[in-house]
């Protein structure tokens, strides 16, 4: 999320951010609010999605019918576009795609070394590392408990999540690595601005000055201070959201068996992305 702040800070006047208000303007594509219309179509489907206390595969089968229609109904001024965020894989279930070229103009995908994801998510959820590895390498549905106005998130496993978006070639895309954003933020910011300009004719005014401000205001220490001062909606009850902001911590915190499990499951995609 620190890296998403880097992106959105470009859409402030000068590239500076001193709170998380701008993130609150970026809605989750999986917000329950976007599915209220189901009540007009099928009260049974509506009740299944909205009234239960937990989601299951039966609910998922119903929910997928409305993915594209929900996105079509999002109110965006004609001739403009909006930004959304999601953790979902671009899955196809019962002939229903999570999204398509009619509702998505383009996307930016940020990958991260799965060995570091395990550590980060383990802290975030207070699950042990072995259980978290199981989530990472096996097909997973997140958000089963109805919290924070969120529907199900279909993550699949790490490698298939990546592949699901990689295969979506009908719209412009930019694939970034968390590690590159940490190690060479200026280069990656330029890649992002080039992506917006070449595909959507969005030109950033005062680009060089903004880059300096973006780098300064979205550095990890500043984001952590903002979280400590103002809180952060996506912080878990178990740990700070902006916890360390480092890479390759897995080298010291995973045992050899844990490393092997992840690497054997995700080998081809890890090689493709330069993690192995």
Language-model regions, residue ranges each:
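PAPS/PAP-binding and catalytic site of the sulfotransferase fold
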Residues: 1-10, 175-202, 214, 222
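PAPS-dependent sulfotransferase catalytic domain
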Residues: 1-176, 244-276
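Secondary-structure transition/capping residues
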Residues: 129, 203, 222-225, 273
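Short, charged, surface-exposed loops that flank catalytic or proteolytic processing sites
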Residues: 133, 203-207
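Short acidic (Asp/Glu) and glycine-rich catalytic loops that position anionic groups and cofactors
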Residues: 170-172, 189-194, 239-245
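Hydrophobic alpha-helical segments
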Residues: 199, 217, 268-272
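PAPS-dependent sulfotransferase catalytic core
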Residues: 209-264
